[in-house]
Every structure is written in structure tokens, then in C-alpha cells.
Amino acid sequence: MTKGKRTFQPNNRRRARVHGFRLRMRTRAGRSIVSSRRRKGRRTLSA
């Protein structure tokens, strides 16, 4: 039985568009995510 291809195909532009900082700042929920990560002291806030 064959396995098939790997599902993770890295792409920096897509990564930024889907999980990036600008996208997080657009919505209220995203802003709360960033603020909670700031409070926790995360080194990276978003992708």
C-alpha cells in the first residue's frame, strides 16, 4: 500500500496570510490572541 505525498508543503506567503500579524490585528478575537501571547511573554506573537 502506498503512503501518498506529505500534506505540509511550506509556503511563507500563505503562512503569513493565514496566520500572520496583520491578519490577527483585523479581528477582535485575533487582537485578544496577540495580547494574551504578549501577557504570557511569548517570543513570537504570530507567524
Swiss-Prot record:
GO MF term set: structural constituent of ribosome
Keyword terms, alphabetized: Ribonucleoprotein, Ribosomal protein
A cellular-component GO term for this protein: ribosome
Highest taxon listed in the record's lineage: Bacteria
PROSITE patterns: RIBOSOMAL_L34
Record-level GO BP terms: translation
InterPro entries (alphabetical): Ribosomal_bL34 (IPR000271), Ribosomal_bL34_CS (IPR020939)
HAMAP family documented for this protein: Ribosomal_bL34
Family assignment from sequence similarity: Belongs to the bacterial ribosomal protein bL34 family.
Entry protein name: Large ribosomal subunit protein bL34
Species this protein is from: Mycobacterium tuberculosis (strain ATCC 25177 / H37Ra)
Lineage start: Bacteria, Bacillati, Actinomycetota, Actinomycetes, Mycobacteriales
Gene: rpmH
